[in-house]
From Swiss-Prot:
Keywords: Cytoplasm, Metal-binding, Zinc, Zinc-finger. PANTHER family: MINI ZINC FINGER PROTEIN 2, ZINC-FINGER HOMEODOMAIN PROTEIN 2. One of its GO terms (biological process) is regulation of developmental process. It comes from Oryza sativa subsp. indica (Rice). One of its GO terms (cellular component) is cytoplasm. This is Mini zinc finger protein 1. Its main location: cytoplasm.
Amino acid sequence: MGPQQDRSAAKPYANGSTAAAAAAGRKENNKVVRYRECQRNHAASIGGHAVDGCREFMASGAEGTAAALLCAACGCHRSFHRREVEAAAAECDCSSDTSSGTGRR
């Protein structure tokens, strides 16, 4: 066996950032992500279009487990549900200064 590796150290990503920096960036966003109606086409194999009517994703298990990615209502994976991101109020530091009078007419 080879030497033991320290698994607690931050591992760099391909872009040079570390896992700790990436996690800190996710926490700063404070965005709420919800998964709404299921969009899985159950009739795709026969050339049709039919959805099951599931209105909102409900996790089957605890956060961090494989079951958390399956919907308790329809049994589909979370990726089949429409993703909705509720962003905080946009903080725009930009201003439109049209009073200079140097624009074209």
